Amino acid sequence: DAAHQAAGYGRINILKYLIEERKIFYAVKLDCVATATRFGKLDCLKYLVEEAKVPLTHMVWVAYARYNEHPDCVNYLLEKGCPEPTDEQYAGFVEYERSKSGQQSGD
């Protein structure tokens, strides 16, 4: 979907157009936050939170940013009040991500 690609590649102008002019669904906006955090696109993340008013309600967004080593996104999410995963939740997230990519624990 175009909105996910825009968020993942940091194409903020396209993302703005899709949200403001094409009126994409709320669920797609949530997925765009996940995509922006996964790929470390802080400008897109800020737009989604500050202008598109996507509420930061999912701890998985912090987990995506942390797992993919985007500390600027982690810090931003936490500063804005996004819930942080517990150690147990994060361990489960890591296990799930590794299983998707075929990695084993300890690799």
Language-model segments: which ranges?
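Ankyrin repeat domain, specifically the short helix-to-loop turn at the C-terminus of the second helix
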Residues: 16-25, 46-55, 76-83
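Conserved ankyrin/ankyrin-like repeat signature
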Residues: 13-14, 43-44, 72-73
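Small side chains
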Residues: 3, 16, 44-46, 65
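Ankyrin-repeat-protein effector appendages
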Residues: 71-107
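Ankyrin-repeat boundary/"N-cap" motif
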Residues: 1-5, 26-35, 55-66, 87-93
